[in-house]
Curated annotation (Swiss-Prot):
NCBIfam families: YphP_YqiW. InterPro entries: BrxB/BrxA (IPR009474). Belongs to the bacilliredoxin family. This is Bacilliredoxin BCE_2233. Pfam families: Disulph_isomer.
Length: 144
């Protein structure tokens, strides 16, 4: 059963979801969608663990969107899960991150099912947009 707070949050995060979707990211909103995607996808994937926090709005989402536009080499796939909103999907995605502690927002570059690059929240909070974009571009150059 949905309460007023949950409905408010669902409405509030719509623009936060759409920002990544407009940049070409596919939303994975269920545990099953995450499993199906990971188990049936080859190549490289940039995963953005989205969040409602200010560093997601001001740094993570715009940096991810700009990096995939600017980079010469790009991941084959772009997906996102939303921490705190799509809890089962986020928990399932984090299982594929292995021993990496939960962090939101965060970004993971996967090669197949293996995490080859990870950007934690603390690396996002203390960086500029250009630094995050460069971090991603270098990871794409090395792994894509």
């Amino acid at each position: 059963m949905s309460n007023a707070y949950e409905e408010y949050m669902r409405q509030m995060v719509i623009p936060m979801r759409q920002e990544l979707v407009r940049s070409g990211f596919e939303e994975l909103t269920t545990e099953e969608a995450v499993t199906e995607f990971i188990e049936n996808t080859t190549g490289t994937t940039l995963v953005v663990v989205n969040s409602v926090c200010g560093c997601a709005a001001g740094l993570a989402r715009p940096s991810a969107g700009q990096a995939v536009v600017r980079a010469e080499k790009q991941p084959d796939h772009l997906v996102t899960v939303f921490a705190g909103q799509d809890k089962d999907a986020t928990a399932k995605m984090r299982e594929y991150f292995g021993e990496i502690p939960p962090s939101s927002p965060s970004m993971a570059l996967l090669k197949g099912k293996e995490v080859v690059h990870f950007i934690h929240r603390h690396e996002i909070e203390g960086a500029t947009m250009d630094e995050i974009i460069t971090n991603l571009e270098q990871a794409f150059e090395k792994n894509c």
